[in-house]
Amino acid sequence: MDDKTFTKELDQWVEQLNECKQLNENQVRTLCEKAKEILTKESNVQEVRCPVTVCGDVHGQFHDLMELFRIGGKSPDTNYLFMGDYVDRGYYSVETVTLLVALKVRYPERITILRGNHESRQITQVYGFYDECLRKYGNANVWKYFTDLFDYLPLTALVDGQIFCLHGGLSPSIDTLDHIRALDRLQEVPHEGPMCDLLWSDPDDRGGWGISPRGAGYTFGQDISETFNHANGLTLVSRAHQLVMEGYNWCHDRNVVTIFSAPNYCYRCGNQAAIMELDDTLKYSFLQFDPAPRRGEPHVTRRTPDYFL
């Protein structure tokens, strides 16, 4: 089908997804193939221009993603950069990730989607996305289309050469952005090594490198962040990956900011969510938001497993 016809169809898919209605299996397959063509051209350190709005974990909380767009502006009117973790834990991982990928295919210059530690075959089999795909489609094909696509997602982004965005954090194997550019990202997230660290590491109050309680990645201190930012001409590392009660949290003397965009995480944590708006001079402001009003969602009684992922 020609580009014009496909764009028309894509607009219909986006409209449908905005109503939280899933696409059928064939449509998902087509969408993922188109997305691969776009993502394969993107760098491990994808260059992004400001103004842009930077978002953290969404975790299948579709109605809260709608609230995020309400607060931050619709795509493509607002440029967005999402730092991973679209799936697992929330009840609408399928609709959430399908919508974000559809927006990426429709407006490739207006939205950037990075890989999080949950964009992985192994993690999604444990934390909900795999089971949700089985439940909603009756087989694992859609799960396979998406997890194959996840291998293509860029690992990091660089806003105007100054603000470095990624899901997790820094790595003892990586001193420069060129080290990241040289990685082969087209694979499942490894258990260890630089690619793993970028998606799993966390900032810490202690200096230097530490063993991560998550069992993957490292903890890194302010000395590490300052050295990395200085060596690479950066003003800030922006990352997600950790629940923060106000939706955003500065650390390491403002060398690092954590942004978390899933309010009342797992429908039980009681946290606010936030997004970071960067204007055309790279001035930042944070917009906080609470959960969208919900109708007819399963009442959460099961205690969510203690999480370190």
Curated annotation (Swiss-Prot):
<keyword id="KW-0378">Hydrolase</keyword>
<feature type="binding site">
    <location>
        <position position="117"/>
    </location>
    <ligand>
        <name>Mn(2+) 2</name>
    </ligand>
</feature>
<dbReference type="GO" id="GO:0046872">
    <property type="term" value="F:metal ion binding"/>
</dbReference>
<dbReference type="GO" id="GO:0004722">
    <property type="term" value="F:protein serine/threonine phosphatase activity"/>
</dbReference>
<feature type="modified residue" description="Leucine methyl ester">
    <location>
        <position position="309"/>
    </location>
</feature>
<keyword id="KW-0539">Nucleus</keyword>
<feature type="binding site">
    <location>
        <position position="167"/>
    </location>
    <ligand>
        <name>Mn(2+) 2</name>
    </ligand>
</feature>
<comment type="subunit">
    <text>Found in a complex with at least ARL2, PPP2CB, PPP2R1A, PPP2R2A, PPP2R5E and TBCD. Interacts with TBCD. PP2A consists of a common heterodimeric core enzyme (composed of a 36 kDa catalytic subunit (subunit C) and a 65 kDa constant regulatory subunit (PR65) (subunit A)) that associates with a variety of regulatory subunits. Proteins that associate with the core dimer include three families of regulatory subunits B (the R2/B/PR55/B55, R3/B''/PR72/PR130/PR59 and R5/B'/B56 families), the 48 kDa variable regulatory subunit, viral proteins, and cell signaling molecules. Binds PPME1.</text>
</comment>
<comment type="function">
    <text>Catalytic subunit of protein phosphatase 2A (PP2A), a serine/threonine phosphatase involved in the regulation of a wide variety of enzymes, signal transduction pathways, and cellular events. PP2A can modulate the activity of phosphorylase B kinase, casein kinase 2, mitogen-stimulated S6 kinase, and MAP-2 kinase. Part of the striatin-interacting phosphatase and kinase (STRIPAK) complexes. STRIPAK complexes have critical roles in protein (de)phosphorylation and are regulators of multiple signaling pathways including Hippo, MAPK, nuclear receptor and cytoskeleton remodeling.</text>
</comment>
<feature type="binding site">
    <location>
        <position position="241"/>
    </location>
    <ligand>
        <name>Mn(2+) 2</name>
    </ligand>
</feature>
<keyword id="KW-0832">Ubl conjugation</keyword>
<keyword id="KW-0158">Chromosome</keyword>
<dbReference type="Pfam" id="PF00149">
    <property type="entry name" value="Metallophos"/>
</dbReference>
<feature type="binding site">
    <location>
        <position position="85"/>
    </location>
    <ligand>
        <name>Mn(2+) 2</name>
    </ligand>
</feature>
<keyword id="KW-0597">Phosphoprotein</keyword>
<keyword id="KW-0137">Centromere</keyword>
<feature type="binding site">
    <location>
        <position position="59"/>
    </location>
    <ligand>
        <name>Mn(2+) 1</name>
    </ligand>
</feature>
<keyword id="KW-0963">Cytoplasm</keyword>
<dbReference type="InterPro" id="IPR004843">
    <property type="entry name" value="Calcineurin-like_PHP_ApaH"/>
</dbReference>
<dbReference type="GO" id="GO:0005634">
    <property type="term" value="C:nucleus"/>
</dbReference>
<feature type="modified residue" description="Phosphotyrosine">
    <location>
        <position position="307"/>
    </location>
</feature>
<keyword id="KW-0464">Manganese</keyword>
<keyword id="KW-0479">Metal-binding</keyword>
<keyword id="KW-0904">Protein phosphatase</keyword>
<dbReference type="InterPro" id="IPR047129">
    <property type="entry name" value="PPA2-like"/>
</dbReference>
<protein>
    <recommendedName>
        <fullName>Serine/threonine-protein phosphatase 2A catalytic subunit beta isoform</fullName>
        <ecNumber>3.1.3.16</ecNumber>
    </recommendedName>
</protein>
<feature type="active site" description="Proton donor">
    <location>
        <position position="118"/>
    </location>
</feature>
<feature type="binding site">
    <location>
        <position position="57"/>
    </location>
    <ligand>
        <name>Mn(2+) 1</name>
    </ligand>
</feature>
<dbReference type="GO" id="GO:0000922">
    <property type="term" value="C:spindle pole"/>
</dbReference>
<dbReference type="InterPro" id="IPR029052">
    <property type="entry name" value="Metallo-depent_PP-like"/>
</dbReference>
<dbReference type="GO" id="GO:0000775">
    <property type="term" value="C:chromosome, centromeric region"/>
</dbReference>
<dbReference type="GO" id="GO:0005737">
    <property type="term" value="C:cytoplasm"/>
</dbReference>
<dbReference type="GO" id="GO:0090443">
    <property type="term" value="C:FAR/SIN/STRIPAK complex"/>
</dbReference>
<keyword id="KW-0488">Methylation</keyword>
<dbReference type="InterPro" id="IPR006186">
    <property type="entry name" value="Ser/Thr-sp_prot-phosphatase"/>
</dbReference>
<feature type="binding site">
    <location>
        <position position="85"/>
    </location>
    <ligand>
        <name>Mn(2+) 1</name>
    </ligand>
</feature>
<keyword id="KW-0206">Cytoskeleton</keyword>
<comment type="similarity">
    <text>Belongs to the PPP phosphatase family. PP-1 subfamily.</text>
</comment>
